From Swiss-Prot:
GO terms for cellular component: plasma membrane; proton-transporting ATP synthase complex. It comes from the Bacteria. NCBIfam families: ATP_synt_epsi (TIGR01216), PRK01474.1 (NF002403). The keyword Ribonucleoprotein does not apply. This is ATP synthase epsilon chain. InterPro entries: ATP_synth_F1_dsu/esu, ATP_synth_F1_dsu/esu_N, ATPsynth_dsu/esu_N. Keywords: ATP synthesis, Cell inner membrane, Cell membrane, CF(1), Hydrogen ion transport, Ion transport, Membrane, Transport. It comes from Rickettsia akari (strain Hartford).
Length: 112
């Protein structure tokens, strides 16, 4: 399977990621879901969690981003993930990722 899909992670300030991938897994409001090329078109609410991008194969993610809530647009050729926050956590430990995720999940009233 050589087909790829364009994955974009977009925040209000920048495009955090834009690259071709074999697969991407995304934290939707109804649970995690995976997207390969030629996926059915859909719009999905995004919840805070990990977006894993599989570049070389569909078994080991090479890039991982921690994202806040937002929206995901999926088509057969691309995935646009629009989120308030996107943090590249590829090289962080599980404990560091868990701490950052807790910060994203706090209600806004607790963050100020």
């Amino acid at each position: 399977m050589n087909e790829t899909i364009l994955v974009k992670i977009i925040t209000p300030l920048s495009i955090a990621l834009e690259r071709q991938a074999k697969m991407v897994t995304i934290p939707g409001e109804d649970g995690m879901f995976g997207v390969l090329s030629n996926h059915a078109t859909m719009i999905v609410s995004l919840k805070a969690g990990l977006v894993q991008v599989y570049i070389d194969d569909i078994y080991n993610p090479q890039i991982t981003y921690l994202v806040s809530s937002g929206v995901t647009e999926v088509t057969g050729s691309y995935v646009n993930i629009a989120t308030e926050t996107a943090i590249n956590v590829t090289n962080l430990s599980e404990a560091e990722i868990a701490t950052k995720l807790q910060g994203l999940q706090k209600p806004l009233s607790e963050q100020h």
